Structures are given as C-alpha cells and as structure tokens.
Design a protein with these regions (language model features):
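Compositionally biased, proline/threonine/alanine/serine-rich low-complexity intrinsically disordered stretches
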Residues: 22-46
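Bacterial N-terminal signal peptides that target proteins for export
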Residues: 1-11
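Short hydrophobic alpha-helical segments that form membrane-spanning helices or hydrophobic packing faces
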Residues: 66-72, 191
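Low-complexity, repeat-rich tail regions
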Residues: 25-30, 145-149, 155-292
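Mature extracellular/secreted ectodomains of secretory-pathway proteins
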Residues: 70, 74-178
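Mature N-terminal segment immediately following signal peptide/propeptide cleavage
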Residues: 43-66
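Bacterial N-terminal signal peptides
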Residues: 9-19
Length: 292
C-alpha cells in the first residue's frame, strides 16, 4: 500500500472520529452544592400592650373555655372548617352532638373539637382569621406572657367593678396574678359577651356596671369529657395549661410534631342521631363582644 493511500485512510478515520465526537451529547453538569439548612423562622414576639389587646376579647372567658380557646387557636388553619361544621350541626347538643362528631370521623385536633359545642366562639374565630392566627402564634411563642396578659385584663375588669362572682361563674382570687374564673356548675359553661372598650376602662358616671357582661344559655359539656372538658385548668403561677392534669406543651418549635396529651376514647353509648343538616345564617353566632 502506497504512502498516499495510508495518509488518505488516516485522514478519513480522523474525520469520522471527529464527527462521532461532535454528535455525542455533552457531559451532564456537575451536581449543585447541597442546600444550606436554615433554622426555622423566629417566633413573632409581641410587647405586653400588644398582648393585652390580643387577649381582651377572651380574657373574661371562664378558665375551662379559655384554655380550650387558647389551645385551639394554635390550629388556626382548622378553625374555618370546624366553624362551618358546628354551624351546620348547631341543633345538636350533648350526647347527640358527641355522637355526630364521632360518626363524621372529624380530623380536627382535640382542642378544636372541644369547641364544637360553642359555634359562636368558633364563628368569632373564623370571622377574624388574622386575630386567631396572631393569638395562636402568641400562645405557641409566648404562653407565659399571654397568660400574664389575661391576668392583667382580669384585674382591670375587677378594679372597675365588672368582673365579680354571679350565677354563672365564681371569681376566685388566689393571689397576685392568679384570678380564676370557674363555672358554678362544672357541667355547664356560659359564654360571656362584653365590649372590651367598656369593661376594661373606668365606668362612665351613672353607668350600671352590672350590664357590662351578659351571658348566653349554658352549654352542657358533660358529654365532651373525651375532649378535655373533664379536667382543664390553668397553673397561673407556673404558666401552664393543664388538660387531664397534664401540661399542654405545644410550642413554636415543636408545633409540627406535638401530639395532644390525651387520646380520644371510644364513643360513649347514646341515642340515635338526629339528621337535620340545616345551615343557619352565620350572623346568629357572632359574639357580641366582637362587635365594636
């Protein structure tokens, strides 16, 4: 074979190799560096005066209802659906309502389900989602400060003559910063209605302070012991919310993993469920103290 032939063959082989290389896909890009892990967003912190304004609409709730409201507010995303369900079933009470909750297999947190007998409270929370989320965030991040704010507002209402024992609840003063509001009958809870602009300010001359707080009908909670109503209280001096004698300990840090301290037992026997799914106008359940 001549030298010319060999050179020509080499050139052809080189051209073929270059063509193959040109048609080959480019190598994949290098993997990106591992994402940097950032700490969770810091908890929003409120000043005492802001906390006073935040809790004023619920500060005079009796302790058991206040405890359920504060813990339920930390699940603010569940409140609208719970309020809608409670409104649709507001014709049920006691064991009938408890049975409906079980039969509908509701997936709310127990603290939210504990408020289902109180459609007016849930409606107030659902109608003001910004307030509810702010309250829940404060409870998660600043529970001691939230409880102190409640005590400051209760002290104001006492000083101005609005908060005192009556037929619905007993006001018990255990010491500074320890004002308890307890139902007269533990099986029934009365929701107080009041205007914060009135009860937390000095009364006007000639104003009858006894008209500053009114009450709706008593709500029977005996059928809702599984949802914490059998034993819920505050340790005001230790800044604890106690459910079934165990501290409720959900915080801003563990809010994604915390499990309620009690489990819901099997449904208690009761009568047949009444079906009458009639949605009532939401305005019927607006708390009076929310209308300023």
């Amino acid at each position: 074979m001549s030298t010319t032939t060999l050179l020509r063959a080499g050139m052809i082989a080189g051209i073929v190799s270059m063509t193959i290389l040109a048609q080959a896909p480019p190598p994949p890009p290098p993997p990106p560096p591992p994402a940097q892990e950032y700490p969770p967003a810091p908890a929003p912190m409120l000043a005492p005066q802001q906390l006073d304004q935040l809790v004023e609409r619920v500060a005079l709730y009796p302790d058991p209802l206040l405890g359920q409201t504060l813990t339920a507010s930390t699940y603010w995303n569940e409140i609208p659906d719970a309020a809608a369900w409670a409104n649709q079933h507001n014709y049920l009470q006691g064991d009938q309502l408890s049975r409906a909750i079980y039969e509908d297999n509701l997936n709310f947190d127990p603290s939210v389900m504990a408020l289902l007998p109180f459609p007016g409270v849930l409606d107030m929370m659902a109608r003001d989602p910004g307030w509810t989320q702010a309250l829940g965030s404060a409870v998660l991040a600043q529970r001691p400060e939230v409880m102190d704010a409640v005590q400051r507002m209760r002290q104001k209402a006492m000083d101005y003559g609005y908060l005192e024992s009556n037929a619905q609840y007993r006001v018990v003063v255990e010491g500074p910063g320890d004002i308890e509001i307890l139902p007269v009958n533990a099986g029934y809870v009365y929701v107080p209605y009041y205007n914060p602009l009135i009860v937390f300010a000095p009364p006007r001359p000639g104003f009858f302070v006894g008209a500053g707080i009114t009450f709706g009908p008593g709500i029977y909670v005996g059928a809702f012991a599984p949802f914490g109503w059998s034993s819920i209280a505050f340790g005001w001096r230790t800044h604890e919310i106690l459910i079934d004698s165990r501290p409720w300990a959900r915080t801003w840090v563990n809010r994604g993993t915390y499990v309620h301290p009690y489990a819901i037992p099997a449904m208690r026997p009761g009568g047949a469920r009444v079906e009458r799914h009639v949605e009532r106008p939401a305005e019927r359940h607006v708390e009076r103290h929310d209308r300023r």
